[in-house]
């Protein structure tokens, strides 16, 4: 069962959205680098990483032919439910499903039927890829903050990259292991 998602407005919409996200990301990263107020820095970094999730979403859903090799999604030898529980993924999952972020992607929640399991399994791959793209973009911001000796901005950047990209990637892999052990 293959499910495709159409992006509103087609390729032009995606290009315009990318352009807008790029401009916003640049100004947010500059503001993060220059601010001395920690709470403002924290809020700006959150917005910056929320934008990186947008890059991943629009790239993956607009251009599904550029997918990652299926080998990437296969369970690795070291992966088990215990491994992910040790990393705190179950704790993260419980916090996520009780937060406002649960409203962002309603497609990923099962509706109690076996027919939805395949759709959910494929959706975990889409979500993981979107967050992987965000994680890689976040690494660029880490390098930029390090190059400018903005270590407080770097620490906020690392925190949000972990919470908004790395842990969601781990959660998607954890969910696939639960579905197909």
For the regions a language model picked out, list residue spans one by one.
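Membrane-proximal soluble regions of multi-pass membrane proteins
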Residues: 61-120, 177
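Cytosolic-side membrane-entry/anchor segment at the start of a transmembrane helix
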Residues: 1-50, 170-180
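Hydrophobic core segments of alpha-helical transmembrane domains in multi-pass membrane proteins
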Residues: 40-49, 141, 153-162
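Hydrophobic alpha-helical transmembrane segments of multipass integral membrane proteins
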Residues: 18-21, 132-142, 158, 162
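Helix-coil boundary and interhelical linker segments in multi-pass alpha-helical membrane proteins
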Residues: 29-35, 144-152
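Structural signature of transmembrane alpha-helix termini at the membrane-water interface
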Residues: 23, 27, 58, 140-147, ...
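Transmembrane alpha-helical segments that form the membrane-embedded catalytic/substrate-channel core
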Residues: 49-65, 162-174
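Transmembrane alpha-helical segments and their cytosolic interface motifs
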Residues: 119-149
């Amino acid at each position: 069962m293959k499910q495709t998602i159409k992006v509103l407005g087609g390729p032009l919409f995606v290009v315009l959205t990318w352009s807008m996200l790029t401009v916003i990301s640049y100004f947010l990263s500059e503001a993060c680098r220059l601010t001395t107020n920690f709470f403002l820095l924290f809020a700006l970094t959150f917005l910056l990483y929320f934008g990186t999730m947008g890059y991943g979403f629009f790239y993956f859903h607009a251009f599904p032919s550029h997918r990652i090799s299926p080998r990437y999604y296969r369970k690795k030898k070291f992966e088990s439910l215990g491994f992910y529980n040790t990393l705190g993924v179950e704790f993260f999952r419980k916090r996520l499903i009780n937060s406002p972020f649960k409203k962002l992607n309603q497609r990923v929640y099962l509706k109690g039927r076996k027919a939805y399991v395949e759709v959910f399994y494929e959706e975990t791959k889409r979500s993981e890829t979107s967050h992987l793209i965000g994680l890689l973009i976040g690494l660029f911001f880490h390098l930029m903050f390090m190059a400018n000796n903005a270590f407080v901005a770097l620490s906020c950047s690392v925190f949000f990259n972990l919470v908004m990209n790395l842990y969601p990637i781990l959660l998607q892999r954890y969910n696939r292991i639960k579905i197909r052990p």
